Regions:
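Conserved ABC ATPase "signature" region
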Residues: 114-130
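Hydrophobic anchor residue at the start of the ABC signature
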Residues: 147-148
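Catalytic Walker B motif of ABC-type/P-loop ATPase nucleotide-binding domains
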Residues: 159-163
């Protein structure tokens, strides 16, 4: 196995509301090209953990390091381009699909390759004509795939995926799983994926399981048959 560089490290991270511990004493690392799943029953803090890594909420205790730096010291805009978060409910904006896919390039003051969008759409079995389709005319599954394609335009080092296949049918769910797996291996992107779907475990290097009652964790390597 080739040596991987460290991208992310959580050290005894915890988060609580005024009355309840949501996650507690979470520690793990994520290396370049590594694929980790986060599983566990509803209410154990999976999405909260992902939002902390995405710098959408701050931990009450512990520290999160990205390439050795505390993420609270980094520019939120720059960090979120390198650590890209895709929510369970996709948040699209503007009038058309094109408005969403061009956005990551605009904020970097760059232009995509002429075929970039067509190639990415084809990977997700979407026609190039969808670029001019109004956001309001998209199905739930189309919205989720467009949101994921938009996140890939940031060329991130880490993808954070929160139940992203929940709105997809079985065919598209398998397709998205395979596409992300290939993308991770080709680009050496690291992935943290929150899921309830045991079928997605087949692509994971390791599985982090959060337990109820303050989201304590256990971590295990996935052994392929």
């Amino acid at each position: 196995m080739t040596e991987r560089s460290m991208l992310l490290e959580l050290k005894q991270v915890g988060y609580r509301t005024a009355t309840t511990k949501i996650v507690n004493n979470i520690s793990f690392t994520l290396q370049r090209g590594e694929f980790k799943l986060i599983t566990g029953p509803s209410g154990c803090g999976k999405s909260t953990l992902l939002k902390m890594v995405a710098s959408l909420i701050s931990p009450d205790i512990g520290v999160i390091l990205f390439e050795g730096q505390d993420i609270t010291t980094l520019s939120p805009e720059a960090y979120r381009q390198q650590v890209s978060y895709c929510a369970q409910t996709p948040a699209l904006f503007g009038d058309t699909v094109y408005d969403n896919l061009i956005f990551p390039w605009q904020i970097r003051h760059q232009r995509p390759q002429p075929t970039a969008f067509a190639d990415d759409l084809a990977r997700f079995e979407l026609p190039e004509t969808i670029l001019q389709k109004p956001i309001t005319a998209l199905s739930g599954g189309e919205k989720q795939r467009i949101a994921l394609i938009r996140n890939l335009q940031f060329l991130p080092k880490i993808l954070l995926l929160d139940e992203i296949t929940s709105a997809l049918d079985e065919h598209n769910k398998r397709n998205v799983n395979d596409i992300i797996h290939r993308y991770v291996r080709d680009k050496q992107v690291a992935v943290l994926w929150v899921t309830h779907d045991k079928d997605e475990i087949q692509h994971a290097d390791k599985v982090i399981t959060l337990t109820p009652f303050a989201g304590e964790m256990q971590e295990a390597r996935y052994e392929r048959a």
